[in-house]
Amino acid sequence: MEKLFNGSEYNQKVIFDHPSGLFVLFFTEMWERFSYYGMRAILVLFLTSSIMNEGWGWERADALELYALYTGLVYLTPLIGGILADKYFGYRNATVMGALIMALGHGSMALEYFSDSFFFLGIALLIIGNGLFKPNISSIVGQLYKDDDIRKDGAYTIFYMGINCGAFLGILLCGYLGEKVGWHWGFGLAGIFMFFGMLQFYFAQTIFGDVGLKPQKKVNDSNIEKTSSWPTSVEWDRISVILVFSAATIFFWWAFEQAGGSMTIFAGDYTERNLSGDSSLIFKTVNTIITIVPMVIITYVLFKLFQNIFKKYFLSNFFLGTSFVIIWGIVIWMINNEFSQEATEIPASWFSVLNSLFIIIFAPIFSKIWASKYNPSGPIKFAIGLILLGLGFAFLSYGSMSIPFGAKTASVSIFWLVFAYLFHTLGELCVSPVGLSYVSKLAPVRLVGLMFGFWLLSSAIANSLGGLTGSYICLLYTSDAADEGLGVDLGGRRI
């Protein structure tokens, strides 16, 4: 009987019409993004927080410059990681090594309380580990399917949901622990779940069969010449499309990635986050709903996976199940802690949750549209994404008009930030999953890891530019900058 999917017989067992192996990758990526976005959500806040609050007391511009360096390199190293996996390690080994190195990196950052050196060592390990992990787990997703399988687009949408489920939980919980309990608790929690994600993947990887093994295991006498040849003219055309699309996305992510930098500072210093009375109760109720509902849905997916592969891959599922028990415990503690207090202060990192929340809500809708007769072309989707991104910044710009120039703090309504995240997310849904699918479809099989590396290279450039732009915004918007003569005088107001 012919297999529906590549991989072992257990990978033929379906969940929502997709192979079980996809959901092994779903949860592995979910925990990796939990750790990445959880740490990123508190990075700038930690650096700019006062020493009295156990932060480092850095200037905003300096913190955003480090943020730019980190986020840029974290997306640059996948280019090298993709090459190493294509030629030497194989996608699965690279994924495991990257996950382990990142777990060590997060653990090192949690020790910053004892020495600053641990913090910078952790940053370096995260950059290296991400380079091995990020392009190669994405490569495995596409190879689970036959070349002509129309479900591949849907697979990347599901995978993208995993990314955002992890980001949602990571920002919510690492951010809460970091701001409310202690920064090292937030960093440490990120490391714990990166380690769980690595163990879950390692003990279930045979479900992929030959997919993602070392390159030499896939080479035989009949195809040595083919796999070692220079790309054909048709392959060069496909590679060119990937490179052009990757370059175009730089402009989108350049603006979008203000979320982890200048928009986080805006949330912390310029919005009204202290709530009491009815407004406090409403926020706590909404926060509880948006936390519990996604957790219930993700837990349901977990049980579906257990039904298919629990006996065969017991250790993998044991670690996965344990991680969910811990997560549920932290969620219940957080909700109880909030309702035990009359007033509440919304964590500045909480607003970053909105991006992931909106993706979880709207991704299924967009997936249905892309599968219908109303599916626009790639360039049209990209244009729509840019327009929606611009609308988000228009809302934010209008809402911040009341802030006096040079002000260190303000109390702008949080709804302007909510609208900004909404439109940014809708724009992201038009650009990112489409790009991942394009790379998977067009890249030559032997260069899939490298092409995903180039795709992520565009994110590296955009993240660096975004962080640097944020640092300039902070510099130009302070009264110190105005006093030093920075900016251009327009009618008595310096910009």
Per-region residue spans from a language model:
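Intracellular loop-helix junctions on the cytosolic face of multi-pass helical membrane proteins
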Residues: 1-24, 147, 175-343, 366, ...
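Central cavity-lining transmembrane alpha-helices of secondary-active solute carriers
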Residues: 68-83, 357-365
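Conserved MFS/SLC helix-loop-helix module at the cytosolic interface between two early adjacent transmembrane helices
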Residues: 80-98
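C-terminal ends and interior cores of transmembrane alpha-helices
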Residues: 100-114, 388-406
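Hydrophobic core of transmembrane alpha-helices in multi-pass small-molecule transporters
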Residues: 118-133, 408-428
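Intracellular juxtamembrane helix-capping segments at the cytosolic ends
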Residues: 133-146, 430-443
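Glycine-rich segments within core transmembrane alpha-helices of 12-TM secondary carriers
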Residues: 154-171, 178, 456-466
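Conserved small/polar residues in nucleotide/adenosyl-binding loops
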Residues: 477-483, 495
